[in-house]
Amino acid sequence: NPEDWFTPDTCAYGDSNTAWTTCTTPGQTCYTCCSSCFDVVGEQACQMSAQC
């Protein structure tokens, strides 16, 4: 499982394909590469480079 290979990391603003983060979708949580980051309500969020 990819979740065993990669450790999720906090997504820093401006990171490009360097940080791994958790992606939560209905009924599923997975890890994916962060392609771009932005602030949402004081928290950091990622636009994922791949879908869960």
From Swiss-Prot:
Keyword Hydrolase part of the UniProt annotation: no
- Recorded coiled-coil stretches: none
Report the domain of life of the source organism. Answer: Eukaryota
One GO cellular component term noted in the UniProt record for this chain = extracellular region
| Record key words, sorted | Disulfide bond, Pheromone, Secreted
Disulfide pairs here are: C11-C37, C23-C33, C30-C52, C34-C46
Provide the GO MF annotations for this entry. Answer: pheromone activity
- Give the subcellular location: Secreted
Briefly state the protein's biological role. Mating ciliate pheromones (or gamones) are diffusible extracellular communication signals that distinguish different intraspecific classes of cells commonly referred to as 'mating types'. They prepare the latter for conjugation by changing their cell surface properties.
What protein name applies here? Mating pheromone En-1
Species annotation: Euplotes nobilii (Ciliate)
* Species lineage: Eukaryota, Sar, Alveolata, Ciliophora, Intramacronucleata
